[in-house]
Amino acid sequence: MQLSTWNINSLTVRLPQVLEWLAANPVDALGLQELKLTDDKFPHLELEAAGYQCVSHGQKTYNGVAIVSRLPISDVVRNLPNFADEQARVITATLATAQGPLRLINAYFVNGQAPGTDKFAYKLRWLAALTEWVRSQLAHYPRLVLMGDFNVAPDD
C-alpha cells in the first residue's frame, strides 16, 4: 500500500500539479492539508475523473484537509469529536483494503508559535484532543495511520 501526504497550500492554485503528480505516482491514498477552500469548491469531479474518491473538510482562506483515495472510503469523521474547534484540521476515514479496513487520520497540526502564547496553549489542547481521538480509534481499528503536516519543532 502506498500512502502520501502533501501540504498543498491552496488546492485551487495547485490542482493541475496534484493531478499531474497523481498520474505519475498512482498512490492508494493521498492526504492533503491547507486546502484553503470550502467543501462546495472542492474539485471532486476532476479527482474522480482521475480515478480517485475524495472526502474533504474545507475552510475558506485557511486550513482544510482531504483524503483522496483509489480505495473505497467510508465512516468519515470531520474534525475531532472531543474538541470544539472552528478550524478544519482533521479528517478521518476508513479505506477498504485487500487486507481489511484501514483507518486513516489526516491532520494539519496547529503551528503553536512560542511557548507561553495563546496559540501555543491552543496547540497543546489540540494535541491532547488528537491523542485521545487516535487512542479511541485504535481501540476499534488496529490498522491505523496518522498522517499530515505535523508542524512540530523542538520549541514550538
Question: Residue ranges of each PLM-predicted region?
Answer:
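Short, well-ordered, mixed-charge alpha-helical segments that flank or form enzyme active sites
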Residues: N111-T117, P154-D156
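N-terminal, active-site-proximal structural segment of metallo-dependent hydrolase catalytic domains
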Residues: M1-Q53, K60-V65
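Structured beta-strand-rich core segments of catalytic domains in phosphoester-bond hydrolases
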Residues: L35-T38, F42-A114
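Short, flexible loop segments at the rims of nucleotide/cofactor-binding pockets, characterized by
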Residues: W6-L11, N79-N82, A121-L124
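Binuclear metal-dependent hydrolase catalytic cores centered on His/Asp/Glu-rich metal-binding motifs
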Residues: T117-W133
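Active-site beta-strand/loop signature of hydrolases that rely on acidic residues for catalysis
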Residues: W6-N7, L22-D40, L104, W133-D156
